[in-house]
UniProtKB/Swiss-Prot annotation:
Disulfide bonds: none annotated. The chain crosses the membrane at residues 34-54, 72-92, 108-128, 136-158, 195-215, 227-243, 258-278. PANTHER family: PHOSPHATIDYLGLYCEROL--PROLIPOPROTEIN DIACYLGLYCERYL TRANSFERASE, PROLIPOPROTEIN DIACYLGLYCERYL TRANSFERASE. The gene is lgt. GO terms for molecular function: phosphatidylglycerol-prolipoprotein diacylglyceryl transferase activity. Keywords: Cell membrane, Membrane, Transferase, Transmembrane, Transmembrane helix. NCBIfam families: lgt. This is Phosphatidylglycerol--prolipoprotein diacylglyceryl transferase. Its EC number is 2.5.1.145. It comes from Cutibacterium acnes (strain DSM 16379 / KPA171202). Signal peptide: none annotated. Residues 1-21 are annotated as: Disordered. Pfam families: LGT. Catalyzes the transfer of the diacylglyceryl group from phosphatidylglycerol to the sulfhydryl group of the N-terminal cysteine of a prolipoprotein, the first step in the formation of mature lipoproteins. Pathway: Protein modification; lipoprotein biosynthesis (diacylglyceryl transfer).
Amino acid sequence: MRHRRRPGGRSTAGGTPVSQLSIPSPSIEAFHLGPLTIHIYALCILAGIVVAYISGGRRYQARGGKQEQFEELCALAVIAGIIGGRLYHVITDHQLYFGPGRTWYHCFFIWQGGLGIWGAISLGGLAIWLYCRRKGIRFASVADSLAPGILAAQAIGRLGNWFNQELFGRPTSLPWGLEIDLSHRPAGYLQYATFHPTFLYELVWSLVGAVFLLWVDRRWTLDHGRLFTLYVAIYTFGRFWVERLRIDPAHHVGQWRLNDVTALVVFTGAVVILIVLQRRYGKGDEHSSCPAHKTR
């Protein structure tokens, strides 16, 4: 049950006062339609997929691609992405599902939250690459078409974390602190009422990044995988600094959270690849675009 604030903006949950300017957490995570339980987290993921599909489809057709092929590869990518995202989450957070007192089959309850973006992008990307290889489609053209929409989709998906009251950051007294119910606060932080809204930080970062990608592509037409590589660099850089604020349980490599290390490694790789591609293909212009299909 969500703890309500008394007049004057103070929390009834105990601990630190809640600022009148703080961001409230939603009081529900799901709603019912007859016998069906609709989880808002799932709706956010679905909305993100729709945005990426519409954006990517239009951009892919503008590159000379066929809509029916785009629909097929998107269907494969979504299925593979969800499986990959869930696998990454279950593997890296296996203690949540396996061991004494745990219910192993809850690892299949994807609607409760828990998708690792690294697994989603990796397996989803592999599915697209295999499809492109089979159909004679340029993978780079598909990736560049999808890049802005994927980043926008990730922003929308972060709203699901808000409804689930999960993946927030350290306690803060800043006016945009996020109110978290007592039942959702991790051990050692029960006395705090407001936390960094890391979901919002990543949401804003991703939306700004998506707009930037669209602007860059319109200005210079980055092709041959350069726009997608730039997307990877933008996302991982933002994920790195946002991850530094989070306090949810995580595996560590030394003093660093695993996602921090992953983001740093992938960011470095993306920058190196972007430099190589830029040297190979030049700045680019509005008349230079990588076609969707390979020349036979």
